[in-house]
From Swiss-Prot:
SMART domains: TPR (SM00028)
PROSITE patterns on file: TPR, TPR_REGION
TPR repeats: 17-50, 84-117, 119-151, 152-185, 186-219, 221-254, 255-288, 289-318
Name of the protein: TPR repeat-containing protein MJ0940
Origin superkingdom: Archaea
Length: 318
């Protein structure tokens, strides 16, 4: 009789813990994570080995910002489980705390359980980048691409790393693969423009910057700056003016853009106007060497020699 009652109690506890789990999910669905956590704890009081409840608790704690307690839950789960998702999530939490070695160990364990777990591969790639382990990152990208050949972020990360390492032709091959998969991928087009500019193919680089701005409506300030610089290089002053004004609407406090505006007027021999904008650039950034040199040059053209010499000296002191 006692054994029967014990079994009935165990069954009752399991059913009640499931009820609490459902209740927890209902509150979670409404966005009430604290109440959801309360019912998860109730479920775990009745059934301490209820791994799914522990997993949901770990996720809720992480969302609420209690990373350490979330880690405790996941460590408890992974201590006697081969759940690749739990290891991947645990790795993410270690990464948030800056513990990259532990994070990488968790990703390895996750991939040891399921070697084609693309999410774990991607998280590992990101962690390797933050850890400065670039050769391993490239190898990991290749493995990820072998399992998920259409996964664009892997190509983008690989291309960017190859670019940083000076392996430009390989980087271009990765970028071109992305553009085969997604013709107007802005990250890939931006990387292609950067690489083309770096290897001296400036006219082609400008075409890609123009595509980003004029066709794809990209308003990244770095893209605009590069487009302005190359527009000047090829004496496309109308384009340069258009991009300068676009940039200043976004960042009126950007000294480089005011310098470019001064340069535009100097190229048109409007020296007083050029001087005004060079002064604006220097006001925003007193040590802007290019603006100081440009101002000195314009003052010299205007016959204001003493001021010009003073400005040259300021520039040379930097």
């Amino acid at each position: 009789m006692e054994i029967k009652n014990k079994k009935l109690k165990e069954t009752s506890d399991v059913l009640l813990s499931l009820t609490y789990l459902i209740k927890s999910y209902e509150y979670r669905d409404r966005g009430n994570l604290l109440e959801s956590l309360y019912y998860l704890d109730k479920a775990l009081e009745l059934n301490p080995d209820f791994k799914f409840a522990k997993f949901l608790k770990a996720i809720s704690l992480a969302i609420l910002g209690d990373i350490n307690k979330s880690i405790e839950c996941l460590e408890d789960i992974t201590s006697n489980s081969n759940d690749p998702v739990a290891y991947a999530l645990l790795g993410q939490l270690y990464e948030l705390l800056g513990n990259f070695d532990n994070a990488l160990e968790c990703y390895e364990k996750s991939l040891g359980i399921e070697e084609k777990f693309a999410t774990a591969f991607f998280l590992k790639v990101l962690c390797l980048g933050l850890s400065g382990k670039y050769d391993e990152l490239l190898k990991c990208c290749d493995r990820l691409i072998s399992f998920a050949p259409n996964f664009i972020p892997a190509y983008i990360i690989k291309a960017n790393m190859l670019r940083k390492l000076g392996r430009y032709e390989e980087a271009l091959a990765c970028v071109n693969k992305v553009l085969e998969l997604k013709e107007n991928d802005t990250n890939a087009i931006y990387l292609k423009a950067l690489i083309l500019n770096r290897i001296g193919n400036c006219d082609e680089a400008l075409k890609y910057y123009e595509k980003l701005i004029d066709e794809l409506n990209v308003t990244w300030i770095e893209v605009i700056r590069e487009a302005i610089y190359l527009s000047f290089l090829f004496n496309k002053l109308d384009k340069a003016e258009k991009y300068i004004e676009m940039g200043l609407k976004l960042r009126p406090d950007d000294a480089s853009l005011w310098y470019f505006k001064g340069k535009l007027y100097e190229k048109q021999n409007k020296f007083e106007e050029a001087l005004k904008y060079y002064n604006k650039a220097i006001q925003l950034m007193p040590h802007h060497t290019k603006a100081l040199l440009a101002k000195a040059r314009v003052l010299e053209k205007l016959g204001r020699i003493e001021e010009s010499i003073e400005c040259y000296n300021k520039a040379l002191d930097r």
